[in-house]
Structure formats: C-alpha cells, structure tokens
C-alpha cells in the first residue's frame, strides 16, 4: 500500500497504523528487562517513546493502552517487582523528545547533530542506489511532525532529506513542510 502524505490530522493517516506495533516493542523490552532484573536482582527500568502526538492515529499511544500493557505484563510473569515501565512522553510530543535529547547531549558532551543525523523517522525513506545512502522524505506524516519539532526547537535537522528528484536542502524541506503546516492551523 502507498504511504499517505500530509499531516497526522488527516483521516488517511490511519493507513500508517502497524497493528500491535508498540506491544511488539514493549514485549521485547519487558522480556529483556525481566531477565536482567531476575539475573541481577537489581531494579531494571524500561521506557517506551510513545507520545501524545500520535494519540489521534495510533491506539497504542494512549495512557489506557500503556496501563493495560503493564497490567498484562505483571499478571503474566513472576517476579516483576524489579521492573519499572516508563512512558515519559505520553503527554508530550516530538518537540519534547528533541528538547530532552538536546539537553542530554549537552550533559553527556555528545554532539547533537552526530546523534540525530543517524536517526530516521520517515515512513517513506528514500534509498539512493548510487551512493547507498538513506534519506528521509519530508511528505509523510512522521517526517512532517519531525520537521515541525526541529523548527520549534530552532535548529536544522541534521538528517539528510530527499524527494523524487533526489537530495534536497533543509531550506527546501522547511518551505514544503511549512505549506503543509499552514493548511492545518
């Protein structure tokens, strides 16, 4: 199926739902955390990056889902008292995640751009067969939301972007995404 383009608020974005996506992620992290906690006897915490920006489209990004998931984990396993489960961005958005990332990079003396150039949230990543490089698109909802967060943060996204014509500049991305955002104000 074709990945829809535009803003998350549009009804067609429900086509981007991956069934049980966050349950898959949480099941893996819960299993690893429980194994570590059991082996070491130490508190072991997990965190999922689900955030409020996704509530409208993804049912597994809501507090009710998180609580039910944690309950199922605790009911379905022994010795879970040393496993913590956090969803720090449940009431936040991608901007909040970036803002915390910026602070943590500074605190850890890590270059923010070196970290975020290695990330890609695109639902339609573009592969350049000549250079063997991956690019983010700027048209899918996940990319629009990411660009919006970087704009709010006041810094350019270090990740490379492209469209059907090839690599594009950050300025081009900002121009195109600003048009999409203006339609949804």
Where do the PLM segments sit?
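Nucleotide-activated chemistry modules centered on ATP-dependent adenylation/adenylyltransferase
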Residues: 1-185
